[in-house]
Amino acid sequence: MSLNRSEKQAVIDEVTGLAAKAQTLVMAEYRGITVADMTKLRSQAREKGVTLSVLKNTLARRAVAGSAFEVLSDQMTGPLIYGFSIDAVAAAKVVADFAKTNDKLVIRAGAFAGKTLDVEGVKQLANIPSKDVLLAQLCGLLMSPISRTAAVLAALSAQRGAGVEEVAEAAEPAAEVTEAAAA
């Protein structure tokens, strides 16, 4: 299907907007992937906030010109799917996880922070925990000393409470003896 000039410009503008917001771009060759598998990949990407696009490479090159992803322009050849994500690791995770189960999806390259990533770089980026997981781990680390302090205080309180009960029990017979002697 051929696009006229205004349609091409609309695609370029849309992808330029994606590239301006995104932190990461991952490119993968999708030759031989079934429609069902591609639909599954797009669904997984949507859940993670990743925008996947199949674009003409010429339009993709024009769209990323002047952005941090321009470093990938010379690698934009062949049937590629482009994954843009605002989260630094989301696009790499989605594509790498899908490529593990489907050998027809082949990671070609990626870009993060203006640097080109090779296949291994994309896989390493995919292994980094997401922002939400890292924040949860940080909260756990910050809460750990507080939790330990609370546990120690509870244990001391329980020991002290047991000591008070023992003293009270010991004082009761003494009080009974004193009352009997007074009577």
UniProtKB/Swiss-Prot annotation:
Keywords of the record: Ribonucleoprotein, Ribosomal protein, RNA-binding, rRNA-binding
Name the UniProt record assigns to this protein: Large ribosomal subunit protein uL10
Gene Ontology CC: one annotated term: large ribosomal subunit
One Gene Ontology term of the molecular function aspect: large ribosomal subunit rRNA binding
Subunit field text: Part of the ribosomal stalk of the 50S ribosomal subunit. The N-terminus interacts with L11 and the large rRNA to form the base of the stalk. The C-terminus forms an elongated spine to which L12 dimers bind in a sequential fashion forming a multimeric L10(L12)X complex.
Name of the coding gene: rplJ
GO terms of biological process kind: translation
Physiological role: Forms part of the ribosomal stalk, playing a central role in the interaction of the ribosome with GTP-bound translation factors.
Xref: PANTHER family: 39S RIBOSOMAL PROTEIN L10, MITOCHONDRIAL (PTHR11560)
SUPFAM superfamilies to which the protein is assigned, alphabetical: Ribosomal protein L10-like
Organism of provenance: Polaromonas naphthalenivorans (strain CJ2)
Upper taxonomic lineage: Bacteria, Pseudomonadati, Pseudomonadota, Betaproteobacteria, Burkholderiales
Family named by the database record: Belongs to the universal ribosomal protein uL10 family.
